From Swiss-Prot:
It comes from the Eukaryota. This is UPF0329 protein ECU07_0050/ECU09_2020. Belongs to the UPF0329 family. Pfam families: DUF1609 (PF07753).
Amino acid sequence: MDAGEHTKGGSSRGRLVAIGVLECGGRKVSGVVEVGTFKDPGGCPVVYHLMFRPTDLEELGGVMSPEFVKANDIEKIDEDKEYQDESKFVYPPGVTFETVKAADVFQVVWRNPSDTSEILRRLTIHRRPCVI
């Protein structure tokens, strides 16, 4: 569900709330995903906010370790760390990410930088068509 756009700091920002599936270690947990985006000076969309809330809280502990949650704490910004993106969003040490987009879904994929064929986590966000 597109939750609308607003302007902040001179850039247009969009917000999307959707259903998502977080995969990690062979386990899948469904939940609600909130995504905030803006366009960089080149016109490419940039994800600046990504939040996943599981619908089954018992499964969360098996998919997301406490270290992963702590590493994503916005208060832990360090200018010299290489494991943060341009918006200073902090990822666990050594983890990189990519966004894969299709018409009805897009994915955020975290890969092991030492072995890029190894996917550490994958968040699939399902877009629903607008129903009037």
